[in-house]
Amino acid sequence: MKTLYRDNKGLHHWLFACGAVLVLFYLIRGNRAAVNFWVYSVTLPFEQFLGRACAALPFSVAELLYVLAAVTAVVLLVLMVRYLIKSRQKGRAAYRCALFVLDLFLTVCAAFSLLWGANYYADDFCDRSDLSPEPVTYEDLVRVTQYFADHLAEASMHIARDENGLFTADRQEILNYADTVYDCLYDEFPFLDMPDQKPKGIFFSKIMSAMNFTGFYFPFTGESNVNMDSPAMLLASTCAHELSHQRGITSEQQSNFLAVLACTRCDDANYNYAGWMLGYIHLGNALYRVDPDAWQQIRDSLPDEIVLDLRYNSAYWAQYKGLTATVTQSLNDKMIKSYGDELGTQSYGAVVDLLVNYYA
């Protein structure tokens, strides 16, 4: 045993260092004041610095790192297999390889916990705004759903459509507008005021679709990244959602709420449509589970072109239903829950409570 430790001293020190960071994170996460300081005075400014640095590049650095990580993983696998085959002491060689892989894994876990995981234990948007997702009444749910349907119909009159009657827009123009979409919220929520970095489109967007993702925030580069292949009608609200993560907001329900609020208040027609659409989809899904007849009545009041957009969106995502999407979403759900968010990915549906309480 001593020989194993001595022969792999560097790897063991690396392991202990990662373990110490994770233990320290576990012990400190219950101290709200300490976590708030760490998040809002250390990691958030650091991620904003990274975001500004990466903004100078026309491509997603996050996507490049994912590709490099995948290539590196394949190369390391080949090298380790070769090392194991050539080694005379198979057991020691296997131990060294396993220790190296464990070190890499724990390094990523420790870095992610410090840069992003800590945000789950800091004051969130609801804490800082005094808004909370209180339970809502059936009457309020119906009223707010109708309110969103009416405004969605109005917003639909101001956007462009293609020859098939579907929403159409220049996707790059949507991305270019994104860094101003939150300006309309600063008076009401001054703590949201910060310089935004425009979201970046992902080159391998079809892979994102297969994984059932429309966007993601990458704390190691401070970049918001969006799917450029999924239906364009919700691209603007996806941009706004991911920009909320640049502000350290981890809760998906709060990010969706802010996306709706920012999009519907800004002065861009494409963002207005996406905001009312996102809100209507969440509210409509909630109402359908409670009263399908009431949902149908509101759905029937929508103009045909909006129904066409909704059907196109459903058809697009239906083609990607399968094992990949299921596994990816399950892993994402477990990751979110591991940081104390008991709702996991179901917290996406809790945006309804925030919307109804705010608009009722």
What are these regions (language model features)?
Residues A160-M228, A232:
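Auxiliary, metal-adjacent structural segments of Zn-dependent hydrolase domains
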Residues G117-D187:
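Membrane-interface segments at or immediately adjacent to transmembrane helices
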Residues E305-A360:
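Pan-zinc metallopeptidase signature
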Residues P58, L235-N256, V260-L261:
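Active-site recognition of the HExxH zinc-binding catalytic motif
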Residues T3-L15:
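N-terminal membrane topogenic signal
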Residues V74-V78, R92-C126:
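Transmembrane alpha-helices and immediately adjacent membrane-cytoplasm interface residues
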